[in-house]
Amino acid sequence: MATKAFQKIYTKISQITKATCSLKASGVGYDELAMVNGKLAQVVKIMGDEVTLQVFEGTEGIPTNAEVVFLGKSPTLKVSEQLAGRFFNAFGDPIDGGPEIEGQEVPIGGPSVNPVRRKQPSELVATGIAGIDLNNTLVSGQKIPFFADPDQPFNQVMANVALRAETDKIILGGMGMTNDDYLYFKNVFSNAGALDRIISFVNTTENPPVERLLIPDMALTAAEYFAVEHNQKVLVLLTDMTSYADALAIVSNRMDQILSLIHI
């Protein structure tokens, strides 16, 4: 991410942990992005003029006199019809070798819908899988968890749901995937000729675990765009939530915090 010449540069970090660094700064907002010694970071705590940044790649190699530049914005996603059929990382950048997305830039992680104002869920989302449609029915507007042992083929089940679901768009959020898992989904969707209605946000095991925490917000921001702006039926698939919980544990450990079970 490029920085602008007029942005203030801070060079005095007061505290560094394995995942965060703290410094005194002014005019900074919560969730704002920053560059710390060339590494992308995000504001996670503000107490007066003391700002704590979570560094996505970890703080290894960052000195106390490192240059810190705040970017003046929180994580965003460019939304348009061009998202369809593409694969992105946790920051919404293409990872499939295709062109950059042109569209409206919207912040992720916005306020959730007031549940009192929502309509009663009643519309079936058919998957063509009897065990799901009859015993664990997907209904538009609801969240349904799927539990599986590590040795069960849950990726194949997720791919089948994506291909068979009677929806306009499928948003896949992959967290902690192996490269084999990523290539499996990419090849299955491509071979089935279904890429034009599937949008994928992927964090692999080669990426920093902290980035997994952005995947659900990216996926839901894209889903909201197609559902609200285009009145389309959208199904969001997030896999796997165990990796998401592991990322929370890793972040808490690196921030020298005691992990509370309430977080997961």
Regions found by a protein language model. Give the residues of each.
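Nucleotide-state-sensitive switch-loop elements of NTP-binding domains
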Residues: 179-222, 254-257
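Conserved small/polar residues in nucleotide/adenosyl-binding loops
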Residues: 262-264
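Acidic-enriched and Gly/Ser
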Residues: 2-8, 12-127
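Conserved P-loop
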Residues: 153-196
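Phosphate-binding/switch loop-helix module in NTP-utilizing enzymes
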Residues: 212-247
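P-loop NTPase nucleotide-binding/switch module
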Residues: 95-142, 158-160, 196-205, 211-214
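Loop/turn-to-beta-strand initiation segments
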Residues: 169, 197-199, 231-235
